[in-house]
Structure formats: structure tokens, C-alpha cells
Amino acid sequence: MKRILIFISILFFLYIAFEVKNNYYVIPDESIRFRVIANSNSTKDQYIKKRVKEALEKVFYEELKVSNTIDDSRNIIQNNMNNYKKTIKETLEKLNVDMDYEVSFGLNYFPEKEYKGVVYKEGEYESLVITLGNGEGENFWCVLFPPICTLEVEEDDDISYRFLIKDLFDKYILNK
């Protein structure tokens, strides 16, 4: 009897693991994504993409930390497009890189993507997309609202990780 229970338990856990792995999870409908597409997959272009992403994350953190709704976030992003372009330009200049770039905000296509073991469906999503150069390289993406991947960037350039669930609970339930 004990062996049967163990066997059934193992089958149950395998079933759950299989279902979780193969289910699609979606980012909430009311979300704003952020994407940086590299010029190419060369080491140099991927490094440039990373530096642009990091510079913009600092700006986003400062601007969006006061946002409580998707409308707040949308307005902040729309009103700061020139600031994002300036940040990209300054970052490229610091790297001594002369490269075209495009900044667009609106509905943009995202391919199916796996992030931290969760598969997100492809589709058109409201997003801020930065395309560097030819935009033929690997991309970075995350979600600006709700702040699923926002990192708190401190002034000394250290990155501190926060607990998303706690932050969301504090912000939306406790109104901190």
C-alpha cells in the first residue's frame, strides 16, 4: 500500500511539473513592456545593448517609482521620450559608438519568450522599444508596468534586488 501511495504521489508531482512547464502564462493585459534590440549578435553590439539597457533602467526607476496605474506609467513614458533618446545618445557617446537608434512607444510585436521558466505568448503588446543600429541582434525585454523586472538602481551604481511580491503588496495593498 505504501508503494502505491508513493507511486501515485510521484505521478501526481510529475503531472503538475509537466502542466506548469507547458502552460502559457500571460503578463497582465494592462502592462507595458520594454525591449532593447541589439544591432547584431557580436560581443561588442551585445555589450552596447546591455549598457543602453542599464542606463535606461536607472531613468525608468526614478521616473516610474511614483506610478500607481498603467495610465500614470503611460503618461510618464510618453512625456519622457526625448529624455530616453538623450540617455541613449549619451550612453553611445560614452562608449565612443556612432550608431543610429530608434525609440518607439506603442503596439509592437513580441515573439514567444521564456523568462525564468515561464512562457509568454507572442503578440502585439504596448511597449517601449529601442532598436540599436540594424536591430538584427538578440534582445532584452522586461515589463515596466506592472514593475515585474524593475530593479532598484541606487546612486552608487550598485544593483539591489527586491522582492516583487512584497513590493506589489506594499504598494497596492498597504499603499506605502
Describe the function of each predicted region.
Residues 30-78:
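Early exported N-terminus immediately downstream of N-terminal targeting peptides
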Residues 72-111:
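Amphipathic, coiled-coil-like alpha-helical scaffolding segments used for oligomerization/assembly
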Residues 19-29:
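Aromatic-capped interface at the extracytoplasmic side
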Residues 37-41, 106-108, 133-135, 145-148:
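Solvent-exposed coil/turn segments that connect beta secondary-structure elements
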Residues 118-172:
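Soluble extracytoplasmic domains of inner/organellar membrane proteins
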Residues 114-115:
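N-terminal post-signal-peptidase region of extra-cytosolic proteins
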Residues 2-19:
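Hydrophobic membrane-insertion alpha-helices, especially the h-region
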Residues 39, 55-67, 83-95, 151, ...:
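Structured segments of extracytoplasmic/periplasmic soluble domains
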